[in-house]
């Protein structure tokens, strides 16, 4: 069964909240998934994708932070927690889910920043990911993809 875009969006929204929670509590992915399954209405959410995003970000956080760092004007530790959750999620999709068009990842990240972060966060997220995408596209062109 093909997922609807709204179900994917809800998976990303839940994942940003779960990543934020993980960044603060350092609970395991399993514990956070259990909490979300109990406390949140996930009935119209692509739950397998939510789980993939959360576990993927947690297991690859050092790799994702390394990929983001060249495009940040400050250390990753100094980035707002919500912005960091959105950026990590987007970088996970850009590097691990190459079946999802870059434009979709960028647009979704901007919307997530608008939904959850400060008024100016979406501009920061857009700027970081735009620079990262340009670099990613150059590398793909060099590799002949």
UniProtKB/Swiss-Prot annotation:
Belongs to the NusB family. Involved in transcription antitermination. Required for transcription of ribosomal RNA (rRNA) genes. Binds specifically to the boxA antiterminator sequence of the ribosomal RNA (rrn) operons. NCBIfam families: nusB. One of its GO terms (cellular component) is cytosol. SUPFAM superfamilies: NusB-like. It comes from Psychromonas ingrahamii (strain DSM 17664 / CCUG 51855 / 37). The keyword Flavoprotein does not apply. Keywords: RNA-binding, Transcription, Transcription antitermination, Transcription regulation. Disulfide bonds: none annotated. InterPro entries: NusB-like_sf (IPR035926), NusB_fam (IPR011605), NusB_RsmB_TIM44 (IPR006027). The keyword Transcription applies. GO terms for biological process: DNA-templated transcription termination; transcription antitermination. This is Transcription antitermination protein NusB. It comes from the Bacteria. GO terms for molecular function: RNA binding. The gene is nusB. It holds the Pfam family NusB.
